[in-house]
Curated annotation (Swiss-Prot):
Coiled-coil region(s): none
EC number: 2.7.11.15
Native species: Bos taurus (Bovine)
Protein name: G protein-coupled receptor kinase 3
UniProt PTM: Ubiquitinated.
Amino acid sequence: MADLEAVLADVSYLMAMEKSKATPAARASKKIVLPEPSIRSVMQKYLEERHEITFDKIFNQRIGFLLFKDFCLNEINEAVPQVKFYEEIKEYEKLENEEDRLCRSRQIYDTYIMKELLSCSHPFSKQAVEHVQSHLSKKQVTSTLFQPYIEEICESLRGSIFQKFMESDKFTRFCQWKNVELNIHLTMNDFSVHRIIGRGGFGEVYGCRKADTGKMYAMKCLDKKRIKMKQGETLALNERIMLSLVSTGDCPFIVCMTYAFHTPDKLCFILDLMNGGDLHYHLSQHGVFSEKEMRFYATEIILGLEHMHNRFVVYRDLKPANILLDEHGHVRISDLGLACDFSKKKPHASVGTHGYMAPEVLQKGTAYDSSADWFSLGCMLFKLLRGHSPFRQHKTKDKHEIDRMTLTMNVELPDVFSPELKSLLEGLLQRDVSKRLGCHGGSAQELKTHDFFRGIDWQHVYLQKYPPPLIPPRGEVNAADAFDIGSFDEEDTKGIKLLDCDQELYKNFPLVISERWQQEVAETVYEAVNADTDKIEARKRAKNKQLGHEEDYALGRDCIVHGYMLKLGNPFLTQWQRRYFYLFPNRLEWRGEGESRQSLLTMEQIVSVEETQIKDKKCILLRIKGGKQFVLQCESDPEFVQWKKELTETFMEAQRLLRRAPKFLNKSRSAVVELSKPPLCHRNSNGL
């Protein structure tokens, strides 16, 4: 029976994988719903205050670029060929071989440069033209051939074109998407969890599918009780910090994190899913690798380490078991549980796996940095070639003996190794850090220029253009059976109680990596969500021709911010009512959707603006003269932050002005005034 359950778990998992690759959006069981366009008022202020409304910030975000491109190609009157030129250059940079680059570079030159030069309409500098012409004439078609144009294209788009984008519906849509992104609160209900694929000291790893996009991920779940029992809180939180550091910027050679969240019992990391098994497993199945095969893995691992080291992260646990393969055979470095940030203080703890730890790591109290990873790389490459670590001779398992040999033994390299390979390994396995390859100030660049990697195009490595030596079998999970992986004994943690102080440790644990979420959306449901939203907004615009548009009321007035909020209503203050609010310097107005009557609360009547909580939801509490309360709830986190800020500042400024005003202005008024729409329409530009 257990075997049947294991087979069914594998089949379900593999079917989910195949469907996710073909049509991930079709696998989405939840829908992303964009907020209404009126969100722009609040979101623009929110983003501006965080310096997020600039050309570079928007253009360099995936969703921002897609919307800007859509605006340039479909909504602006004047032609904007620069955007297509930019995309052509980006595609050119990904090309694999020189022949393809030569052909494409000439096409780009003829279409976007020569054609405009002949018509005397070329808007770019003479230096950019000469740079491309000079290199093309010598057939020097590197991936950076058009780099001067990238900079000038961005400069040409940064001015009036970007300003027009800011005034368009496409910028409104950008605000809608950013509101969704900044209001993500993940729970287990946002994922379909499949079979277990691994287990560690604190928890398990599962295959899972994200419900609203259909994308497949690995979910690493750490048990909070087990963490407490083993006093591993610092390690667990450190892994979250290290993953957040390395998961920004595109790196195809690290198992990166897209989300982190927690439940009352678990800490959850949502990571890149790797289906090809690990190098330790394949070493046992395939046998030792040739120099050529090892070189392939070395190049990709070097780029992964370079990405970490550029962010001042030392990995400290490099070994074949931590190198995972994807379905195509390319590799990623996984499990950053022992990684460490050395930007402010160098570590000196002895951590890692015996047989791969550098001498300076073994010498307690000795500070080290990225140097330790280059030594570990040497040990790992040796194992791929010989089947064992250079310091684990005769299959000894005595950790003290392995450490002693690491600190004292000179590694003898077999004669079958090529001179270039011997030179590489001798350089990496130097006990003296000052003599070690990668530790002379050039870091990864020292390895890239080593003779062993002569002829390697590192841009091709980055783009994963070299064919892997081993392709994992399709249609297999490439992981141990669920029953072989096993499970934790619940009795171990039966007596462990999680207290409020334990949960407080994890209050800042949740995280969304913006660029990775945007990429996930762009690859899956972006177009479908936009199309659905366009239909909904078109229907609402048609309906509002009779009723009047909520946002229109704020135009041409001194309205500070406007948008939907929930107001605690009815005589018993138990029911939330959705209303459209307008904040002016001296009052807060609101009305129901489609209603013509307007309600008003003056700043003069407000005693204080406070934050409160109702059923774990943050709310804005306005205390009103006479002991009454006015409670508002926002539909997203950014809205709450911005509305609370604007209401507080407006109230404080109104109080300052009232203290200076003549006393006769402070006549008693009712707290809330019901007004019909026509009198409001006849007010002056100050709203009075």
